[in-house]
From Swiss-Prot:
InterPro entries, per database record: ADP-ribosyltransferase_ARG (IPR050999), ART (IPR000768)
UniProt-listed PANTHER family: ADP-RIBOSYLTRANSFERASE, T-CELL ECTO-ADP-RIBOSYLTRANSFERASE 1-RELATED
Domain TR mART core: 61-241
Organism of origin: Mus musculus (Mouse)
Gene transcribed to yield this protein: Art2a
Record-given protein name: T-cell ecto-ADP-ribosyltransferase 1
């Protein structure tokens, strides 16, 4: 008869294969992330994104409600600063919405995109956010701080990226304050060259937020234990080619990547089914 320890190990191992995370909250290159930079298809996406947004609204009620709230806020604040050429209301609304309540579900779906690409109902939102950061980024580098109640781990080898949009602040005291940081999680000290200062596009201007795109790669990583928390310094930022590009624009390249994503999704589905069957059989085998 299989022991409870064996059942636990089997369940744990298969779960790790499905999620693609060997260790929870591992700091790595986020291999499952949707990291589209929309290089070469901005014009196409500008035409297609409004339709994609409506499709996402039909499938994602939370996004629809948060977007409608953000539209109202954006109309109130959009004349408080000047914006670069090409920046429009969709970009501003997306940034405001992100600083609300939708960022958690968006980031979870973005980081684990390859596991279930067919259930990603943030297509236009991701595009507008990404494009907004590209337009607002002045190509200058800045040091920022990101506090989280999660304890991250790093293997000590290789470059890393967040794999999702990452909020940070120019003000260390903001990053280390509640509710962002409880003193037992992780404090990131980041040098970002692709992050954009979005203070004037936020519900919370006092946070001095700098939003970092998930595709920014950091080649120098230093970790240390400080009192009860982990401090991680990320430096030597670079912009590298993404695994996805123009995924929703309908281009040939997008179709090729889509096929890859579908194959990986099938493998994940198979492992989920296998997990359920094995656990069921082990349970039935007990006297």
């Amino acid at each position: 008869m299989p022991s409870n320890n064996f059942k636990f190990f089997l369940t744990w191992w298969l779960t790790q294969q499905v999620t693609g995370l060997a260790v929870p909250f591992m700091l790595d290159m986020a291999p499952n992330a949707f990291d589209d930079q929309y290089e070469g298809c901005v014009e196409d996406m500008e035409k297609k994104a409004p339709q994609l947004l409506q499709e996402d609204f039909n499938m994602n009620e939370e996004l629809k409600l948060e977007w409608e709230k953000a539209e109202i806020k954006w109309k109130e604040i959009k004349n408080c600063m000047s914006y670069p050429a090409g920046f429009h209301d969709f970009h501003g609304t997306a940034l405001v919405a992100y600083t609300g309540n939708i960022h958690r579900s968006l980031n979870e779906a973005t980081r684990e995109f390859k596991i279930n690409p067919g259930n990603f109902h943030y297509k236009a939102f991701h595009y507008y956010l990404t494009r907004a950061l590209q337009l607002l980024s002045d190509q200058g580098c800045r040091s920022v701080y990101r506090g989280t109640n999660v304890r991250f781990r790093y293997t000590g080898k290789g470059s890393v990226r967040f794999g999702h949009f990452a909020s940070s602040s120019l003000n260390r005291s903001v990053a280390t304050s509640s509710p962002f940081f409880n003193g037992q999680g992780t404090l990131f000290i980041i040098k970002t060259c692709l992050g954009a200062h979005i203070k004037h596009c936020s519900y919370y201007t006092h946070e001095e937020e700098v939003l970092i795109p998930g595709y920014e790669v950091f080649h120098k990583v230093k970790t240390q234990s400080v009192e009860r928390y982990i401090q991680i310094s990320l430096d030597s930022p670079k912009r590298k080619k993404s695994n996805f590009n123009c995924f929703y624009s309908g281009s040939t390249q997008a179709a090729n990547v889509s096929s890859l994503g579908s194959r990986e999704s099938c493998v994940s589905l198979f492992l989920v089914v296998l997990l359920g069957l094995l656990v069921q059989q082990l349970t039935l085998a007990e006297p």
